[in-house]
Structure formats: structure tokens, C-alpha cells
């Protein structure tokens, strides 16, 4: 029969992993529980077997299985969900399809629509080398990659050249930069565009004037009878030259690098466009004589011819002309090959046609050099017709020359055309890239685009997440303060545990934490297990939430619930020393050894009484006589009567006598009554047991099978105050708390009985009982355990019982339970117990004389469904020392699921 969740408890909810990273054991469990794993890449889910990813262990996905901590997982993936066994990668989902197929088939292919550089980046991210590409995709991948790298290199060079224009080392850098952009970058502003248009108009006007000056109708005759330029056209040309000169000088003055400016091809063209005009004026005005004038006139004619170079100034404003020039410069190999082929063909065919036509009358092929012209126009398929062969042999040579010319010219021309096309596209792309870069810079200056480093953005987002978590925690505390206690998830603290702690030989780590609050008579004994890998994480969470919800709702008085405020705690130290007393023979009571849970006083008292000892802690040898038992637990500072009630050890009920609180004193057991003498200031505070009616019948000797006497001990209590107040922390944290240590010594063996104490796990999971119970519950730890005889069994009376248990853990945290401790702890356990009742009709939870009933608090959460059959498997040969057995005390749902790879080890009990 499954347990029912308390009202308001959502059993499907798990611990929030938004702010608290999971334990390594939870990560390992999530990976081992399933053979498949979900890979979410860019929102596209893929499901693959773990063994498929193990084929490439050095890749990113291959390392995913070996990551068992939160930090290592975030180094491999971007996010993960352990409940869904899903890992998220914020990458290109299309490229991941090819990569995942490589894990499955061992064949790596690149999709047709993928960019080569993008696919290469994806391969680098997933840790796969590009050499694994198949031959069908490798050529295409490398070709596209080389092409893109070349374009990026050129773009980087262009941008570096433009960014290298620094004006910081010159005078008036801002003004010079603006002037340089105005003259060299027509697209930088509207004024620059207007200036470029005006410059183009001047170039066209100068070219037209140069052409019109050659018309005889417009020319003028001087005194020497020579034709000169028209005066009106000369004035137009002078204005154009003045504009060109001013433009050239402004470019030179505003240029960041003067030498680089002189070497520029466009600047050389500008200089050649204006230089002949000034040379002509200088030569004409300096030589007035007739003889000198005739010589100078020839030179001037040469410079006048150079004026036609002004048309090349249009290349500054034309991308096509710039592409043509750069294409010829980049295609010099192809051009050289073309010229070589033509030269060889001309030489061969001119020689052949000369020997074929030299014997003819009135032949025009008089020599081989004279035949070059025919071979050239024939190979280029021009054919002017001014010279041609007449003989049959000469015509055959002419036909072969035409075919050879077509083949020779046709081979390198396509290469030159492709270069021109590619360079033209590249020029256009670079112009757009420059415009885009300038637009982005303007947008950044205007604040339209915010540039941020990815690491800074991630750090900022993490800070916002922390703030959101803190705000959520504060709002939860203020809104649900009535239902919030120290077990609520809002008060959980994260404590990193090493893997060695969770996998050590210790099966359980006993921790104690006492909660004593203002206006509350409730005492909680919370324990934590350091081996959560034996149970399912989801069930641990469900049980933990169940305990959290059950305790506040089971309290009859809502005012007695926990408040967020906690008074400061102080430290008590109780030491236990042996007191030599006369040995007496203890009468052996003829009572039957209890081997069934039905004969115990309470199921809850039995299920919470098991102590765990490792194999190294069990020793048949008696411990040293001068042994000490230190019990540490936090208590509250006395301030009110309620604080005085809750100040003692766990499950220790002090008398309600008036008087000042004692700090130091001695706690002893009287022969008849169990009392606590606190004689720090002369006052005493008695501890009275509600189980005094059965003192004489229960003797420790009754359970001993030997005649070894039991030493009597005195009890001394030392209280030490610790003023520093510490907040209530969950049991899972490993931080030291203000504790109370107690040392007890037994003065009268007649008042000693045995109870099995077991910690209540903090998350509701109940570990399988496994303990070796000795006569006085032997618990050696680091030389601090008391001396006892051999490990024997106590027979329990059917009536009331008192107990003393020593528990030792690896963290030196001990527990103490005295008579009357369950007055406020346990009254009714039936609401949450779903197991079948004993057949004899008696309710073991209501056994007479078992506990006092001063508080109606429900402790049913300590019960589970198969609790009555827990000890029924104990054999009757419990008198044999060291007998071990398996104890299946709890519900089957506590154990690991059959599908889980984790194991749930059984515990051992020696009865």
C-alpha cells in the first residue's frame, strides 16, 4: 500500500537546480540509469546511445560521459537537465546532423548548403579533425575554404590599409582627415559625392576641349603661319588644369603618407595629366627665337599627346576601370603566356610563308620580318587583306596559321576574363563591407548598437541570476513564513562534498541537529546520510518534503511553529568518567529475549534506534577504562521558561523547577530516581523519569550470559556558553555548529536498560538498519568509548524501559537519549503506518508504559509499511555472539529501482 502525500505536497516536484548545482552522485546516477542520452543542439533534439558517443572519446561528446561534476559539465555543454537526461549545446543544428552521423557511421560529409568556414568552425567546436572528411566532400570543402580565406585576407589587407591612415603624428589631424575623406572617399558624405561629380565633369570637359582643338576650323594661325589652339578652348583647358592641380595638391597635403601617395597608380595618372600643360607653357615662353622655337615645338607636341591620359582620371571614380587595371596586373602570367604563344606562332608561320612565296613574281613576302605582319593579323583573325599568299603551299600555311591563332589566343583569354569577373565582384563586396563597417561604427557612436564581450555578458547574466534567486528566496520567506521552517528548500545551503566522502567505507554519517525555538515545545532530531547514492534522488526528495510538510501540520498549535528568528545558541560539554564502585552480582531476570517488533514498546522507538558501526569500529576487546563519550548538539540560550525546557540534550526532559539556569554542574543517576544535579550556583534541577515504576525489574544483568560485572559510573555535566549565534543549517552542510557535549556515568546498574536509537534522515530516507547491539551498546570511537563486557543482548521487559545508547560517527558527533525523552516526541504513530497490525490485537504503538503522553504530537513519519515484519526474521540463536542477518526494515520504495544501476546494500544486525 503506497503512502499518501500530506495535503499541499507535490510529490513530483524535485529539488530546484536553477540555483543549486547537483551532487556528483546525482549526475552519475542520471547517466547510468539509461543507455541513451538526449542531445539538444540549437533546439533540435537528438537521441543517441552512450556507446555511440564512446567511439570518439577525445571529442566533446566523448568527454561528456566522463564529466561527473557541475563545473566539468558546463565546460563541455551549455546547459543540462538530469531529470530528462538531456544536455544542451547552443550550436548550429544543421551542422550537428553531419557530425552525429559521423559518430554513428564513421563517415563525415558536409552538406551542400553549409558554408565551408562555418562547417570548419563546427568541426573545431566538436573536436573533430577535418581530415576525416570523405573524398567526395573534401575537395569542395577545401576549395571553398581557400576561396573564402583568400577573400578574407584581401578584405583584411584593404581594411588594414584604410585603418593605417593615421593622422595623429601630423598637424591638424582632424581637419586633414576630413579633407582626405572628402577627396578620396566619395561615399563618406554628400559633399564628397558632389565633389566627385564635379571632378568627373572637369575631366570630360578637358577631354572635349582637347579634341576640339585639333579641328582646323577652330584653330588659329600665328605670325609664323603655324596653326595654334583656339583662345576660348585654351581658357577652358586652363581652368580644367587649375582644378586638377588644386585637387592634386590638396590630396598631397592631406595624405597621411606622402611617399605612398606618390607611388599610387591613380596619383601617377593625375600627375601625368597636368604635367604636359606646364611643360608646354614653360618651353613656349622661354624660347622666342625661330630656330629654338621649332625644336621646342616638337617636344610640346609630345606633351600635348600625353594630355589624353586625363581620361584615365575616370578610373578613380569607376570600379570597372579599377578592376580592369588590377585584373591586368594580377593576370600577368596569363598575358605573358599569350604573348609567348603568339610570338612562337608568328615566327614559325612567317618563315613558312616566306619560303612558300619568295619565288613568285611581285611577291610582298620579301623577307621573314616583312612576313611578321601577315602572321600577326592572321593569327589574331583580323585579316586586313593588304598582303596574302598566292601559291597553293602558301595558302595551306595561311590556313594552319589561322587555326593555330584561334587555339593559342583562346586558351589564356578565359583565365583573364575569370580574373576580371572575380576581382570586380570582390571590389563590389569590399565597397559594401566598408559601408557596413562605417554604418556599424556610426550606430555604435549613436548608441543604436551595444558591443559587449561574450564573457562579460555571461558574467553579467550570472549576476542577474544570482540576484533573481536571492529575491525569490526572500519573497518566499516573507510570503510563506507560516509554512517555512528549517527544512524548507528556501533555507537549503549548498555544501560541496568530495567524491571520497560519498564512496567511503562509512555507510552512514550520523549528524545531530536540535531545533529549539521561541514559543515552541517541539524538538526535532534531524540526521543526514552521507551515502545518498544507495537511494533514488527523487524518492529522497519526496520523503524529505513529506517530513517537512508533516511536522508543521501535525502540530496542534499553530503558534508553536518555527519562526525565522532563532536565539543564539550556547555550547554544553558533558564528560563521562568512571567511578569505582563495589561489584555486585546482578540477578539474571528470566525474561525472554525480544526477537519480534511486537514486543517492543513502540515501533517508532525501535526504528529510530539503530546505530551503524563499520567493520573497523567493531572490536571484541574492551575499551580503555578512562574513556569518554562526547555528545554535541546545539541548544538555545536560556531566556524564557520555554528555553529552559529545551536546553537539555535531545530527548532529555528536565524538570520544570524554578531557578536560575546552571552553566556547570554534575549530572548523576540516583539509586531510585533519575535526577540531574546542576550545582553551578548552588541550585539543583532534577530530572525525573516517568518510568520509575519498573526500576527494580529491569536489570542489565538480566540480559548478560556471562558473569562479568558492569562497572558503575558517575555523571558530570559541563555547560559552556557560545555567544555567537549561528543560523539554523540543514543537516547536509558540513559546517561545525555550536554544540553541546555530554559525558554520563552510570551509578546504579539497576536503572540501566537498552533502547536502539536510530537517526532520522534529513530527507526522509530511512537507511537499512545494520548494527551490532551489545549489552551496553558498545561504540568505540578513537579511544573515547566506555568499557563494557563482551557483546551480549539485553532482554527487554514487556513493561516500561529506559535506555542509554552510545553512538559514534566519523565526525565525532554523538547522541544521547534518556528516559522520558519521547514525552513530546512520540504519541501517535498510527496515521502514517500502513502495515498490517499484529495478529494478537495489541497495538505496539500503544503498549502500556511505553512512553508518556504529555504531547499529542504525531510522529507517524517514522513508520513505514513493512515495519512489523522487520525483526521477525531474527533467528532464535541470538545468544550466539556476532550473529549477522539482513534486515529489510523499510518500505520497498526506499530501495533503488530495478532499472537503476546503483545498488542498495543491505545492513547487518547482531541480536
UniProtKB/Swiss-Prot annotation:
Protein name (Swiss-Prot/TrEMBL): Potassium voltage-gated channel subfamily B member 2
Compositionally biased region (Polar residues): 523-534, 685-711, 851-860
TM region(s), chain numbering: 191-212, 233-254, 266-284, 297-317, 333-354, 396-424
Xref: InterPro entries: BTB/POZ_dom, Ion_trans_dom, K_chnl_volt-dep_Kv, K_chnl_volt-dep_Kv2, K_chnl_volt-dep_Kv2.2, SKP1/BTB/POZ_sf, T1-type_BTB, VG_K_chnl
Glycosylation sites: 287
Region feature Disordered, mapped onto this chain: 1-22, 503-534, 549-571, 637-665, 685-739, 760-865, 892-911
Primary location group: membrane
Gene Ontology MF terms in the entry: delayed rectifier potassium channel activity; potassium channel regulator activity; protein heterodimerization activity
Catalytic activity from the UniProt record: K(+)(in) = K(+)(out)
Comment, domains: The transmembrane segment S4 functions as a voltage-sensor and is characterized by a series of positively charged amino acids at every third position. Channel opening and closing is effected by a conformation change that affects the position and orientation of the voltage-sensor paddle formed by S3 and S4 within the membrane. A transmembrane electric field that is positive inside would push the positively charged S4 segment outwards, thereby opening the pore, while a field that is negative inside would pull the S4 segment inwards and close the pore. The FFAT motif is involved in the interaction with VAPA and VAPB and its phosphorylation regulates these interactions.
Membrane topology (UniProt): Multi-pass membrane protein
UniProt entry keywords in alphabetical sequence: Cell membrane, Cell projection, Glycoprotein, Ion channel, Ion transport, Membrane, Phosphoprotein, Potassium, Potassium channel, Potassium transport, Transmembrane, Transmembrane helix, Transport, Voltage-gated channel
Residues modified as Phosphoserine: 448, 608
Mechanisms controlling activity: Inhibited by quinine at micromolar levels. Modestly sensitive to millimolar levels of tetraethylammonium (TEA) and 4-aminopyridine (4-AP).
PANTHER family: POTASSIUM VOLTAGE-GATED CHANNEL SUBFAMILY B MEMBER 2, VOLTAGE-GATED POTASSIUM CHANNEL
Extracellular side: 213-232, 285-296, 355-368, 389-395
GO biological process, alphabetically ordered: action potential; potassium ion transmembrane transport; potassium ion transport; protein homooligomerization; protein localization to plasma membrane; regulation of smooth muscle contraction
Composition-biased stretches (Basic and acidic residues): 508-522, 560-569, 837-849
Functional note: Voltage-gated potassium channel that mediates transmembrane potassium transport in excitable membranes, primarily in the brain and smooth muscle cells. Channels open or close in response to the voltage difference across the membrane, letting potassium ions pass in accordance with their electrochemical gradient. Homotetrameric channels mediate a delayed-rectifier voltage-dependent outward potassium current that display rapid activation and slow inactivation in response to membrane depolarization.
Residue positions of motif FFAT: 605-611
Motif (Selectivity filter): 381-386
PTM characteristics: Phosphorylated. Phosphorylation at Ser-608 of the FFAT motif activates interaction with MOSPD2, VAPA and VAPB.
Cellular localisation: Cell membrane; Perikaryon; Cell projection, Dendrite
Cytoplasmic topological segments: 1-190, 255-265, 318-332, 425-911
Superkingdom of the source species: Eukaryota
Amino acid at each position: 500500500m503506497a503512502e499518501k502525500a500530506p495535503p499541499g505536497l507535490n510529490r513530483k516536484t524535485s529539488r530546484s537546480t536553477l540555483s543549486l548545482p547537483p551532487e556528483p552522485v546525482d549526475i552519475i546516477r542520471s547517466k547510468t540509469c539509461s543507455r541513451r542520452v538526449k542531445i539538444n543542439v540549437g533546439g533540435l533534439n537528438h537521441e543517441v546511445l552512450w556507446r555511440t558517443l564512446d567511439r570518439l572519446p577525445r571529442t566533446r561528446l566523448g568527454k561528456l560521459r566522463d564529466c561527473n561534476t557541475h563545473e566539468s559539465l558546463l565546460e563541455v555543454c551549455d546547459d543540462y537537465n538530469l531529470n530528462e537526461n538531456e544536455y544542451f549545446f547552443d550550436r548550429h543544428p544543421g551542422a550537428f546532423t553531419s557530425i552525429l552521423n559521423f559518430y554513428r557511421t564513421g563517415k563525415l560529409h558536409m552538406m551542400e548548403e553549409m558554408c565551408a568556414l562555418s562547417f570548419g568552425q563546427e568541426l573545431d567546436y566538436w573536436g573533430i579533425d577535418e581530415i576525416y572528411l570523405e573524398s567526395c566532400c573534401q575537395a569542395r570543402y577545401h576549395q571553398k575554404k581557400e576561396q573564402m580565406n583568400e577573400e578574407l585576407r584581401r578584405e583584411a589587407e584593404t581594411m588594414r590599409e584604410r585603418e593605417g591612415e593615421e593622422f595623429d603624428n601630423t598637424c591638424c589631424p582632424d581637419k586633414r582627415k576630413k579633407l582626405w575623406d572628402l577627396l578620396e572617399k566619395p561615399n563618406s558624405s554628400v559633399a564628397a559625392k558632389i565633389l566627385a561629380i564635379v571632378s568627373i565633369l572637369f575631366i570630360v570637359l578637358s577631354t572635349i576641349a582637347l579634341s576640339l582643338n585639333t579641328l582646323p576650323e577652330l584653330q588659329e594661325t600665328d605670325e609664323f603661319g603655324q596653326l595654334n589652339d583656339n583662345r576660348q578652348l585654351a581658357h577652358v583647358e586652363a581652368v580644367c588644369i587649375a582644378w586638377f592641380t588644386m585637387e592634386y595638391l590638396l590630396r598631397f597635403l592631406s595624405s597621411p603618407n606622402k611617399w605612398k601617395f606618390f607611388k599610387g597608380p591613380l596619383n601617377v595618372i593625375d600627375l601625368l595629366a597636368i604635367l604636359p600643360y606646364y611643360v608646354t607653357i614653360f618651353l613656349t615662353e622661354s624660347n622666342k627665337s625661330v630656330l629654338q622655337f621649332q625644336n621646342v615645338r616638337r617636344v610640346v607636341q609630345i606633351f600635348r599627346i600625353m594630355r589624353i591620359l586625363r581620361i584615365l582620371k575616370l578610373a578613380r571614380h569607376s570600379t570597372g576601370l579599377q578592376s580592369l587595371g588590377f585584373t591586368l596586373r594580377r593576370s600577368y602570367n596569363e598575358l605573358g603566356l599569350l604573348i609567348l604563344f603568339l610570338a612562337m606562332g608568328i615566327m614559325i608561320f612567317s618563315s613558312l610563308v616566306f619560303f612558300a612565296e619568295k619565288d613568285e613574281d611581285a611577291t610582298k613576302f620579301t623577307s621573314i620580318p616583312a612576313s611578321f605582319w601577315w602572321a600577326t593579323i592572321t593569327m589574331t583573325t583580323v585579316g586586313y587583306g593588304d598582303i596574302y599568299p598566292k601559291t597553293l603551299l602558301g595558302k595551306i600555311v595561311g590556313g594552319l596559321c589561322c587555326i593555330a591563332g584561334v587555339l593559342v589566343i583562346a586558351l589564356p583569354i578565359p583565365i583573364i576574363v575569370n580574373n576580371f569577373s572575380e576581382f570586380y565582384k570582390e571590389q563590389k563586396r569590399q565597397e559594401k563591407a566598408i559601408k557596413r563597417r562605417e554604418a556599424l561604427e556610426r550606430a555604435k557612436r549613436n548608441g543604436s548598437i551595444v558591443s559587449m564581450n561574450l564573457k562579460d555578458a555571461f558574467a553579467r547574466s550570472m549576476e542577474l541570476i544570482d540576484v533573481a534567486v536571492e529575491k525569490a528566496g526572500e519573497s518566499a520567506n516573507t510570503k510563506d513564513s507560516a509554512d517555512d521552517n528549517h527544512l524548507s528548500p528556501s533555507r537549503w545551503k549548498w555544501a560541496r562534498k568530495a567524491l571520497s566522502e560519498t564512496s567511503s567505507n562509512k555507510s552512514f554519517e550520523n549528524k545531530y541537529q536540535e531545533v529549539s525555538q521561541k514559543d515552541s515545545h517541539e524538538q526535532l532530531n534531524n540526521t543526514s546520510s552521507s551515502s545518498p547514492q544507495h537511494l533514488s534522488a527523487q524518492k529522497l526528495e519526496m520523503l524529505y518534503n513529506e517530513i517537512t510538510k508533516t511536522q508543521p501540520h501535525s502540530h496542534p498549535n499553530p503558534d508553536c511553529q518555527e519562526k525565522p528568528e532563532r536565539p543564539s545558541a550556547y555550547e554544553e560539554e558533558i564528560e563521562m568518567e568512571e567511578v569505582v564502585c563495589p561489584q555486585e552480582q546482578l540477578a539474571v531476570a528470566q525474561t525472554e529475549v525480544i526477537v519480534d517488533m511486537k514486543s517492543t514498546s513502540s515501533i517508532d522507538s525501535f526504528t529510530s534506534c539503530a546505530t551503524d558501526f563499520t567493520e573497523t569500529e567493531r572490536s571484541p576487546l574492551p575499551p580503555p577504562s578512562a574513556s569518554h563519550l562526547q555528545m554535541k548538539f546545539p541548544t538555545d540560550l536560556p531566556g524564557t521558561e520555554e528555553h529552559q525546557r529545551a536546553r537539555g540534550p535531545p530527548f532529555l526532559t528536565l524538570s520544570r523547577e524554578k531557578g536560575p539556569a546552571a552553566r556547570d554542574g554534575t549530572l548523576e543517576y540516583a539509586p531510585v530516581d533519575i535526577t540531574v544535579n546542576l550545582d553551578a550556583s548552588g541550585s539543583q534541577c532534577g530530572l525525573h523519569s516517568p518510568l520509575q515504576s519498573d526500576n527494580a525489574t529491569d536489570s542489565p544483568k538480566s540480559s548478560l550470559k556471562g558473569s562479568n560485572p558492569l562497572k558503575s559510573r558517575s555523571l558530570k555535566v559541563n555547560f559552556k556558553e557560545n555567544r555567537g549565534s549561528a543560523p539554523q543549517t540543514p543537516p547536509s552542510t558540513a559546517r561545525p555548529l555550536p554544540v553541546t557535549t555530554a559525558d554520563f556515568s552510570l551509578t546504579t546498574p539497576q536503572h540501566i536498560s537498552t533502547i536502539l536509537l536510530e537517526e532520522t534522515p534529513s530527507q526522509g530516507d530511512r537507511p537499512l538498519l545494520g548494527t551490532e547491539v551489545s549489552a551496553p551498546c558498545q561504540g568505540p570511537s578513537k579511544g573515547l568509548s566506555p568499557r563494557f563486557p563482551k557483546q551480549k543482548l539485553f532482554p527487554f521487559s514487556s513493561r516500561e524501559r529506559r535506555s542509554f545508547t552510545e553512538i559514534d560517527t566519523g565526525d565525532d558527533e554523538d547522541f544521547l537519549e534518556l528516559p522520558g525523552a519521547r514525552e513530546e516526541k512520540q504519541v501517535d504513530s498510527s496515521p502514517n503506518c500502513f502495515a498490517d497490525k499484529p495478529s494478537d490485537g495489541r497495538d505496539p504503538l500503544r503498549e502500556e508504559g511505553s512512553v508518556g503522553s504529555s504531547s499529542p504530537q504525531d510522529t507517524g513519519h517514522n513508520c513505514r509499511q513493512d515495519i512489523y515484519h522487520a525483526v521477525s526474521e531474527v533467528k532464535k540463536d541470538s545468544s550466539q555472539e556476532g550473529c549477522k542477518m539482513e534486515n529489510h526494515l523499510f518500505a520497498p520504495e526506499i530501495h533503488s529501482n530495478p532499472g537503476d544501476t546503483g545498488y542498495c546494500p543491505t545492513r547487518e544486525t547482531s541480536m
